[in-house]
UniProtKB/Swiss-Prot annotation:
This is U14-ctenitoxin-Co1a. Belongs to the neurotoxin 04 (omega-agtx) family. 03 (type II/III omega-agtx) subfamily. One of its GO terms (molecular function) is calcium channel regulator activity. Keywords: Calcium channel impairing toxin, Disulfide bond, Ion channel impairing toxin, Neurotoxin, Secreted, Toxin, Voltage-gated calcium channel impairing toxin. Its main location: secreted. Disulfide bonds are present. GO terms for cellular component: extracellular region. Omega-agatoxins are antagonists of voltage-gated calcium channels (Cav). Expressed by the venom gland. It is found in: Secreted. Pfam families: Toxin_34. It comes from Ctenus ornatus.
Length: 31
């Protein structure tokens, strides 16, 4: 998965969610 841009939401990909969490860029509901 790729890092998400500021304000974007995760699509359910664990990689994207982890990146999202690590960078505190967006909310992620699915892990």
């Amino acid at each position: 998965g790729n890092c998400l841009e500021l304000g974007e939401y995760c699509d359910g990909s664990k990689d994207d969610c982890q990146c999202c969490r690590d960078n505190a860029y967006c909310g992620c509901d699915i892990f």
